[in-house]
Structures are given as structure tokens and as C-alpha cells.
Amino acid sequence: MKQGIHPDYHPVVFMDSATGFKFISGSTKTSKETVKWEDGKEYPLVRVEISSDSHPFYTGKQKFTQADGRVDRFNKKYGLDKK
């Protein structure tokens, strides 16, 4: 690898804006905002809108929408649906 061309990889705290959930991970992302972590060190804080703590897929609150197929739309259009 060439020296001096790669971004700095360092630990960063990511915070879910919706829930306040925080986790630490390695990243090249940086921020002027910092936060003191559980180990007593200060790390850059990056706010994210959605994380595994608030995303419906991971929380189990996912809504499944059933899109009508072509046959269902045809039946509705011509009044052939069974109700």
C-alpha cells in the first residue's frame, strides 16, 4: 500500500438519532462533535438516522404490504372478485 493516500481509520461512536442508541465501530468518518465512551476515552460522534436499534426489519415491527397481482387487479376491474 502507498503511504499517505488512504483515509485515517479510527474508532468512532455512532448514535441513532431516533432512539439514542450508541455503538462504537471503526470508520474513516469523522466529526467535530465528540462523546466520552464507557472506557473513559473521547471519540468522534457521528449521528445516524437509522440503525439496527430503530430499523423496522431488526425491531420486528416490519409491516408487510401485499401488492395486488395482475390477476387480482383484473378481477377487481371487471367485478369478478369474490367478496
Curated annotation (Swiss-Prot):
Top-rank taxon, per record: Bacteria
Coiled coil, from the record: none
Keyword Ribosomal protein carried by entry: yes
UniProt KW keywords: Ribonucleoprotein, Ribosomal protein
GO cellular component, as recorded: ribonucleoprotein complex; ribosome
InterPro entries: Ribosomal_bL28/bL31-like_sf, Ribosomal_bL31, Ribosomal_bL31_B, Ribosomal_bL31_sf
PROSITE patterns attached to this UniProt entry: RIBOSOMAL_L31
GO biological processes: translation
Record GO terms (molecular function): structural constituent of ribosome
Complex and partners: Part of the 50S ribosomal subunit.
Family, per entry: Belongs to the bacterial ribosomal protein bL31 family. Type B subfamily.
Name of the protein: Large ribosomal subunit protein bL31B
Organism: Lacticaseibacillus paracasei (strain ATCC 334 / BCRC 17002 / CCUG 31169 / CIP 107868 / KCTC 3260 / NRRL B-441)
Higher taxonomy: Bacteria, Bacillati, Bacillota, Bacilli, Lactobacillales
